[in-house]
Amino acid sequence: MKLKQIELKNFRNYEDLKLDFHPNLNIFLGQNAQGKTNILEAIHFLALTRSHRTSHDKELIRWSGQEMKVSGLVEKAHATVPLEVQLSSKGRIAKANHLKENRLADYIGQLKILMFAPENLELVKGSPATRRRFMDIELGQIHAVYLYDSMRYNRALKERNAYLKFDQAKIDKNFLTVLDEQLAEHGNKIMFERKTFIEKLEIHAKKIHEQLTHGLETLKITYNQNVKTDFSKELLSRQDHDIFRHQTTVGPHRDDLQFFINDINVADFGSQGQQRTVALSIKLAEIDLIFEETGEYPILLLDDVMSELDNHRQLDLIETSLGKTQTFITTTTLDHLKNLPENLSIFHVTDGTIEKEKE
């Protein structure tokens, strides 16, 4: 899978931009706040219909515009597929092969991506919500049905929580049980998919981590499932408690992940270097896992992370990804990028203007 071309209309600081990409490696070079990250954000938006930087859609539309559009050409094994995502006050419209997808869940996965940015360290040391979002994004690209179940679960959770905010005297437990059954139906599928995904991810990440640490460290990933027994029974047993708390206190919306090195919790006791290595191991593992599950390698987006890694980790990242994935890198300097291949494109970014260096 390769992204051959992208076109932006009123996206962030770009009024009208069209770029053709190298199938191997693309580097966006420039000082901070010039628009480098906006290009990777646009690719992320084209793939997932959402930004990785903001939840406020208005921020994505250029200040003088009322709507924006990101379109691209994705080269797959047997065809080149045009993709397009439009955003306006009316919402999102996603198209694949010029045909509108009625559900975003049917669109996501057309362009598979892996984003690696400095904030990815939050996967290890951040909040449980960050780790749940990680599972949801990656599983949504691999299995469209997971995204569907996740959306249905969140809708049912919202409905149950709204009902729990009623006065206790007005709550009908029979109706609450109906809501419980809807929640459990989709929640059980989510938990099964998450458990399977983490088990497979750990196999790949463990091997990579041992290579990165020369066999000195063993990585373990634990999926902490909030539901301990039967989801339906736990919801039923907690009805009185949930009515008192006015919220649903059990379910996959409270799941978490933990990372261990030699049986030591990395978030609590690991050094920053160890946390970075764990995050890197996971990202590299995802490359092979996505291929294993879908038959397609994802596109790798590296947003200002090379300066965060030492030369050894940089080399591991480049050697593992190149030859498998099309890679996009943003950076302020090439000084810390060692052993770059000759077949690449370099784009110079200055105040929203992009010039491609002659190859």
Curated annotation (Swiss-Prot):
This is DNA replication and repair protein RecF. Disulfide bonds: none annotated. InterPro entries: DNA-binding_RecF (IPR001238), DNA-binding_RecF_CS (IPR018078), P-loop_NTPase (IPR027417), RecF/RecN/SMC_N (IPR003395), RecF_2 (IPR042174). The gene is recF. GO terms for molecular function: ATP binding; single-stranded DNA binding. Belongs to the RecF family. Gene3D superfamilies: P-loop containing nucleotide triphosphate hydrolases, RecF/RecN/SMC, N-terminal domain. It comes from the Bacteria. Keywords: ATP-binding, Cytoplasm, DNA damage, DNA repair, DNA replication, DNA-binding, Nucleotide-binding, SOS response. GO terms for biological process: DNA replication; DNA synthesis involved in DNA repair; double-strand break repair; SOS response. CDD domains: ABC_RecF. It comes from Lactococcus lactis subsp. cremoris (strain MG1363). ATP binds at G30, Q31, N32, A33, Q34, G35, K36, T37.
